[in-house]
Amino acid sequence: MSLDIVILAAGQGTRMRSALPKVLHPVAGNSMLGHVIHSARQLQPQGIHVVIGHGAELVRERLAADDLNFVMQNKQLGTGHAVAQALPALTADTVLVLYGDVPLIEVETLQRLLAKANDQQLGLLTVTLDDPTGYGRIVRDEQGRVTAIVEHKDANDAQKAIKEGNTGILALPAARLADWMGRLSNNNAQGEYYLTDVIAMAVADGLVVATEQPHDAMEVQGANDRRQLSELERHYQLREGRRLMAQGVTLRDPARFDVRGEVSVGRDVLIDINVILEGKVVIEDDVQIGPNCVIKNTTLRKGAVVKANSHLEGAVMGEGSDAGPFARLRPGSVLDAKAHVGNFVELKNAHLGEGAKAGHLTYLGDAEIGARTNIGAGTITCNYDGANKFKTVMGEDVFIGSNNSLVAPVEIKAGATTAAGSTITQAVEAGDLAVARARQRNISGWKRPEKIKKS
């Protein structure tokens, strides 16, 4: 069975009170529409058709991809009208309709729904709620068969008492769609063309409407305002937390933990409070992450330790290495096994060999640092001349004294030592000691300046 997916994303979202189109508002670092597209792709359809309207150019710009067909809805005349705009592009056997502001829908739920759809049967996703206010109601006959969907504003009191609501997500035979779209009417309280009216048409045409429900009602929750958006965010984070804990992660507090990307984890991982994981993060076995850390597009090898208040981006921490507290690893930073980066150390495009150490108050940029080398406190690599970047190379077993300025390009060879307070501008040969500072001069009888007395 071939599949086309239509995603409705044309709404303005006035209750968001924002210049940003509603579907571009983020949940967990990705737009709501981005989440829906991600789920759609996992179903491997032959086409994904995104119906856009308000803020169309910005939506297209943010999400443009070769596998997406953007369809313009110039006037927002209802969900049925929106689907009709995509009709000329639909060639598959089945059409699945999704919504750009319903980001938490699970792929497994959609797979169960699609399994119920064929040329003689619609698949309709419904949800049972204690308070279904705002939802269209699922009307069934005495045998429990779905006969129609009545929108909330058009429902009578008896219909409003129904607890089963329409999520709007449905799978239907493409061969019938054009006929049903042509028969839609806007004779209703909203003056719109409701997609839900095809349910009654399908029943009248002798088709069966088979229903499916999500495991969790939050899967089908949309966001019309900032409060609902925050509810989706928190539910997403708790869901991700449960997923990670099921894989062997200890979260000190799942309510104070955020995932904003794709995270893969090993076993016996410990993550403290207020940790944010962004982009693609790989965490291997026995890793420990302290509180208040931000980790983005980073790999943490087995047994690595990230201490409190550290910020890592585009970095790789080797097996048994550690960083922090208050460490910053910028893109291109690599720590080999058992390397150590302490508090208030910043790395950028720097590679620390196995067992190398930079304990505190240090900046290392564009640097290659050999195994077991020790970097003293207050050391900086002077890697930028205002126009170009240059590299600092340190061999194995180098000892850099405190408060050194290493003016790149420069090489300090294996086993060399630099004295505290040195400004190193020339190569230091293997095993040598480099002293590059002014000789101390003591002045006897020195008197400190005195404040000038005001008259």
From Swiss-Prot:
Binding sites annotated in the UniProt record for acetyl-CoA: A377, N383, Y384, S402, A420, R437
Cofactor binding remark: Binds 1 Mg(2+) ion per subunit.
UniProt catalytic activity: alpha-D-glucosamine 1-phosphate + acetyl-CoA = N-acetyl-alpha-D-glucosamine 1-phosphate + CoA + H(+); N-acetyl-alpha-D-glucosamine 1-phosphate + UTP + H(+) = UDP-N-acetyl-alpha-D-glucosamine + diphosphate
Record region (Linker): 227-247
Pfam families reported in the protein's UniProt record: Hexapep, Hexapep_2, NTP_transf_3
Pathway the protein takes part in: Nucleotide-sugar biosynthesis; UDP-N-acetyl-alpha-D-glucosamine biosynthesis; N-acetyl-alpha-D-glucosamine 1-phosphate from alpha-D-glucosamine 6-phosphate (route II): step 2/2; Nucleotide-sugar biosynthesis; UDP-N-acetyl-alpha-D-glucosamine biosynthesis; UDP-N-acetyl-alpha-D-glucosamine from N-acetyl-alpha-D-glucosamine 1-phosphate: step 1/1; Bacterial outer membrane biogenesis; LPS lipid A biosynthesis
Location, primary (coarse class): cytoplasm
Cellular component aspect of the GO annotation: cytoplasm; membrane
Cofactor(s) demanded: Mg(2+)
Keywords: Acyltransferase, Cell shape, Cell wall biogenesis/degradation, Cytoplasm, Magnesium, Metal-binding, Multifunctional enzyme, Nucleotidyltransferase, Peptidoglycan synthesis, Repeat, Transferase
Region (Pyrophosphorylase): 1-226
Residues the entry annotates as binding UDP-N-acetyl-alpha-D-glucosamine: 8-11, 22, 73, 78-79, 99-101, 136, 151, 166, 224, 330, 348, 363, 374
Catalytic machinery residues: H360
GO annotation, biological process: cell morphogenesis; cell wall organization; lipid A biosynthetic process; peptidoglycan biosynthetic process; regulation of cell shape; UDP-N-acetylglucosamine biosynthetic process
KW Disulfide bond (keyword) present: no
Subcellular localization: Cytoplasm
GO MF annotation list: glucosamine-1-phosphate N-acetyltransferase activity; magnesium ion binding; UDP-N-acetylglucosamine diphosphorylase activity
Residue numbers spanned by region N-acetyltransferase: 248-455
Residues bound to Mg(2+): D101, N224
Top-level EC class: transferase
Organism domain of life: Bacteria
Task of the protein: Catalyzes the last two sequential reactions in the de novo biosynthetic pathway for UDP-N-acetylglucosamine (UDP-GlcNAc). The C-terminal domain catalyzes the transfer of acetyl group from acetyl coenzyme A to glucosamine-1-phosphate (GlcN-1-P) to produce N-acetylglucosamine-1-phosphate (GlcNAc-1-P), which is converted into UDP-GlcNAc by the transfer of uridine 5-monophosphate (from uridine 5-triphosphate), a reaction catalyzed by the N-terminal domain.
Family that this chain belongs to: In the N-terminal section; belongs to the N-acetylglucosamine-1-phosphate uridyltransferase family. In the C-terminal section; belongs to the transferase hexapeptide repeat family.
Subunit structure: Homotrimer.
UniProt cross-references to HAMAP family, sorted A to Z: GlmU
Protein's name in the database: Bifunctional protein GlmU
